[in-house]
A protein has these predicted regions:
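Extended, low-polarity transmembrane helix blocks
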Residues: 1-25, 43-55, 62-134
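Short juxtamembrane and helix-loop transition motifs at transmembrane-helix boundaries
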Residues: 9, 27-40
Length: 134
């Protein structure tokens, strides 16, 4: 079950770790993206986004005790991007359709992250409990 867990964890976090790597590699473009969405200071939000995407992904992929934290951080980040970048309810119908689909996909990703956190608890690497060290 562990190899399948890791394949699934890598897949469910792909959009985050690949984005984090791309944002770090093209930091000037990332600064422009943050400024486009009105996030100032842009360097702060760019660095925070990269750190969250990479660290959150690593926590989920590694599984174990803190996988839920990585999944929760990525899920909250994903939910926050809906009103920030995909506010379909503010757009005319012809423009709203695509943004609504992206928002719906984001909700599916959140569900996948919730399942990843659960599976990490059930099948991920086992960490010693406090009782086991006494």
């Amino acid at each position: 079950m562990k190899p399948l867990f890791y394949v699934g964890a890598i897949a469910v976090t792909f959009m985050f770790w690949s984005s984090g790597i791309a944002k770090a590699a093209h930091f000037s473009g990332t600064l422009g993206e943050m400024a486009h969405f009105g996030l100032q200071p842009a360097w702060f939000f760019a660095a925070g986004t990269i750190a969250l995407q990479l660290a959150g992904s690593a926590l989920v992929v590694l599984g174990g005790r803190f996988a839920w934290l990585g999944a929760a951080a990525l899920a909250l980040f994903t939910l926050a991007t809906i009103p920030l970048g995909h506010a379909f309810w503010t757009l005319p119908p012809e423009a709203a359709f695509g943004e609504r689909l992206i928002a719906e996909e984001h909700l599916s990703v959140v569900g996948g992250l919730m399942l990843a956190a659960l599976l990490a608890k059930l099948y991920g690497p086992k960490w010693p409990s406090r009782d086991a060290t006494r």
